[in-house]
Amino acid sequence: MTIQTLFKPDGPLASHIDGFKARAPQLEMAEAVARAIKSGGRLLVEAGTGTGKTYAYLVPALESGKRVVISTGSKNLQEQLFYRDLPTITGALSYTPPVALLKGRSNYLCIERMNRLLSESHLQKPEILNDLVKVKSWSIATDNGDVGDIPGLQENAEILAHVTSTNDNCLGRDCPYYDDCHLVVARRRAMDAQVVVINHHLFFADMAVKDTGFGELVPQAQVYVFDEAHQLPEIATNYFGKSVGSRTIQDLAQDIQLAYRAEAHDMAQLGKAADRLAIASQDLRLAFGVDGGRGNTRDMLRQPLWGQALARLNDAIGLCYEVLKLALGRGEQLDHAFERISELRTRLGEVLAVNQTGFSYWYDCSRLHFTLNLTPLSVAERFSAEVQRPEVAWVFTSATLTVDMRFDHFKAELGLAGSAELILDSPFDYGEQARLCVPRYLPEPNAFGRGEQLANLMIPLINKTPGGCFFLCTSHQVMRQVAEVLRREIGRTVLLQGEDNKQRLLKEFVENGRAVLVATSSFWEGIDVRGAALSCVIIDKLPFASPDDPLLKARVDDCKLKGGDPFAELQLPKAVIALKQGVGRLIRDRTDHGVLVICDPRMVNKPYGATFIKSLPAIPRTRELGTLGSFFDRTERCE
């Protein structure tokens, strides 16, 4: 059956799916995907919000009968595809291939680590014990081991790190529970499936494993579809680099202690070596200073106190290595700990070998933890080699792939020159549904107290807004300033990112209907609030990355060395993509109405402002905040 027939008004999709009506851009995308699948090669599709891109790639992918891997940028979309969209489409096509959902290892219960924690329960904190009871009770009945399903457990609960595994602490085939391992079972299902739904992190983890020559995590396929593909460059960069973090070090120190008690309690030096490792990790964190932050590792290596703390950590790692070497053969936990300390020693040397070219060496330090990172400046060559497989189709789609209607930036980041391209506008009527305002008399982007000034400037608009409002900020400092003023001055519920987890904040926002949510980057994308609950999106300034970001600095320097223009080639495109994501929160349906306010004068008084405007949907623009109230009045009358 042809794609056109499947999408016809009297076709199988319309007959099976209530309210389904094919849109012209959706059909155009589906036909392009079908051609790519038939001929192989690469296809880039920017599909505006409301295009219906999920069905546009699912239908031809399933109709092809080939093995398909679909990768998403978020677990939410991954689950939506598997539990909602795939059953709908397979039902409409009367075709039920074996399908599988596969997540990364941190999503699955590790039976061995849970049982080890139970055996050491007398050593645990009360809050860990309370959650351990929930985990154990749930583990008896679960059929997939997905820890996201544990009832009554916070999504960031401390216990999750203790009952899931990492690449470092997994015992692999030496584990006594290997045959019952939830992760192993999930991977087996995926290997037997025709359609596998994964996420981008898992795709790149699989590439990293294949590079080592030790098997694979994701089955080979004939068709790969990447939804939310704009996230790929950043995720790829993280996976093709290396890192050493204090969490990993302290987790290893704890596991050495447990192995000492369980398998070699006569070797007191094991316990002492583990203590020394944990203390050395904590000392290195303190050497970063109270504020922490991000920076260049080369700069830290020049500081004597930091160098001394690093030397103590190296000594502690060396001691653990020698003591564990003496304990080899006394137990599986000890043998595995020796493998991990060997890997840690090697990796620490790699992230500190700061004289290699083509990499950024940087650290990220929070209140309690640090990470030392080695990150490649470009992943284009490595990724391009991956997508050259003959007779394999690669489809990349998102609402935000282009800058000024061109794919150049995305193609350069991933080495996708020569790909077929398709840009599809949103079917929404932005002329009727939305207004864009860049107000006059704005404070400068780096003005002192800017958050307070913006909040006071926006109060009349927020009060006039019939529904809810997102106030999206580019820094936590401005976010807190805005929230403080709004809570003092307006009679609405003001929700603040960080005061509760993301899902509960969104739930309260939607249920309230007139709340203001003040947030930063994590709410710029992947949020779908339809109807009047979100009628206004305010963006504090253009989302340029901080010039102090060590990875950006390294890329800027590299671009200059090659004779390029780092602002035009790096900073501007990334800011445009980020702004398009933030703007995309506003209109999610044909019946939505709302206003978008961008509080940055550079949109109109800098030459590059035109690039931002041309990259956004064709929303009628104004500079007068006061006119937005009449837009709301008109839309309310129409309703």
Range-by-range predicted roles:
Residues 439-449, 499-604:
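Conserved RecA-like P-loop NTPase helicase motor core
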